[in-house]
């Protein structure tokens, strides 16, 4: 017998596969018609559009699930996220540096789709790893 826990775990693994393949249409298919992201209502295309600059700058961006907890209609995940900085990102030109960050996400599932998501990704660590704040010119300037 398949439990709700097993069903939600499988749902999330299917979603994560789309994420790691950078399949934005596939990702959007897992969202309700209006999904709240960090309490802000959005439509699926607006959610997936947020991934475009990230994937453009880090074409090998990859989420590795470290932990998953299912509690009722909620899925909590802890990830290690990696990628190589191959394109401009938030004003920093490509460095070729590899980044590794932590991410924590909580999903609320309704009718087999994600209706709400709260996400905390350590993007400050990614920015430090690609050199934001470093003296890149050797003269004290940034």
Describe the residue ranges of each PLM region.
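C-terminal and inter-domain tail/linker signature
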Residues: 1-142
């Amino acid at each position: 017998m398949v439990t709700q826990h097993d069903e939600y775990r499988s749902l999330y693994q299917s979603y994560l596969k789309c994420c790691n393949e950078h399949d934005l249409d596939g990702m959007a298919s897992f969202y309700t018609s209006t999904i709240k992201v960090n309490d802000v209502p959005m439509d699926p295309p607006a959610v997936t559009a947020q991934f475009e600059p990230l994937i453009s700058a880090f074409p090998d961006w990859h989420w590795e699930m470290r932990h998953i907890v299912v509690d009722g209609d909620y899925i909590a995940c802890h990830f290690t996220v990696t990628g190589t900085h191959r394109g401009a990102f938030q004003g920093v030109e490509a460095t070729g540096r590899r980044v590794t960050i932590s991410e924590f996400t909580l999903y609320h599932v309704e009718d087999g789709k994600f209706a709400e998501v709260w996400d905390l990704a350590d993007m400050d660590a990614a920015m430090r790893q690609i050199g934001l704040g470093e003296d890149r010119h050797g003269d004290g300037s940034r």
